[in-house]
Amino acid sequence: MSQVNKGEGAAGRVAGVIVSHGQVANELLSAAETIIGSFKHITAVSIGWHDDVEAAKNEIRRAVERVSEGGGVLLMTDMFGGTPTNIASMFLQQGAVEVVTGVNLPMVIKLAGLQPGVPLEEAARLVRDQGRQGIYLAGELLAGGGRKG
């Protein structure tokens, strides 16, 4: 893979690539843009059930290069242990590319709203934490029993 600009000391924004099975990635991106407006630093790669691994890897590589703004790239995948995560993990590069699994809509919105200059590692933690905080058992919450998070 060609080198991605490292986020250390860079004023660039952390960019993102949502990678998923089926059309989940495209739909998450579309939903986020409907809620907060369009943005250019996050894109989606949907891996079809019968897609070739090398072709998927090349598509992710192109997406990373397309959105990179100098602050690193966060690959957000749908499920730990799945093909999208396994392929995305090939791109891990300290300070330049990180992978967070279990992507949901609050995570995409969080990344979209981060300001330039936030280091990649911090952005990854903030996005992960936002995803966790967005998970509730609605029945418990409505019954006053708290939340899962």
Predicted regions and their residues:
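N-terminal loops that bind phosphate or other acidic moieties
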Residues: 1-149
